A protein has these predicted regions:
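Hydrophobic core of alpha-helical transmembrane segments in multi-pass integral membrane proteins
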Residues: 38-45
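Interfacial segments of alpha-helical transmembrane regions
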Residues: 45-64
Length: 177
């Protein structure tokens, strides 16, 4: 898992550098690259752990995410900020957050923060490049997180989760048997 953590951190730091440069095309391209990297990382983790059940869980979550996302795009047909069609919800955000939540819930640990940071950058890139409104990205993120949360079960190893629901926050350790 450590090589994946380092790869995700390198990509997030690269994306942060683009933010400082402020180049809209570079930010959009970095978001597109992360859109491919996040699901590939989620699938790669299942392969690394020889976790066939995890592969099925991620496939189900991603399928539901994409099906609902594209169904809503054609049902709502909201105009994009750049004048295009099918803005709501953001497919980039939905799939990115689906992958990030899958990695968090299935494996926890060191991949959680960089995966969510990368997914957040994907969402930011969609708004910065005028492809989506903020509410498109938030709806896509909620859809992706919800799908993965519903379909994913913690792996048989230890799972570390941060819970901000209480006033003080909580760190939860769990292990599936």
């Amino acid at each position: 898992v450590r090589p994946l953590f380092l790869l995700l951190m390198a990509i997030v730091l690269f994306a942060a550098g683009l933010l400082q440069a402020g180049e809209q095309d570079a930010i959009r391209t970095a978001g597109d690259v992360l859109l491919a990297v996040l699901p590939a990382s989620a699938a790669g983790l299942t392969w690394y752990h020889h976790d066939f059940q995890g592969t099925l869980q991620f496939a189900r979550a991603a399928s539901l995410t994409l099906g609902v996302t594209f169904g809503l795009k054609y049902l709502v047909n909201e105009k994009r900020p750049d004048g295009g069609e099918h803005s709501f919800p953001s497919g980039h955000a939905s799939l990115s957050f689906c992958a990030a939540e899958f990695m968090r819930k299935r494996y926890g640990g060191s991949v959680t923060i960089p995966a969510y940071a990368a997914a957040a950058f994907v969402g930011y890139s969609r708004v910065a490049s005028k492809r989506h409104y903020t509410h498109d990205v938030l709806a896509g993120a909620a859809l992706g997180i919800g799908s993965s949360y519903f379909f994913t079960r913690p792996w048989h190893g230890w799972c570390v989760q941060l819970d901000g629901g209480s006033r003080h926050g909580m760190l939860r350790l769990s292990r599936a048997w």
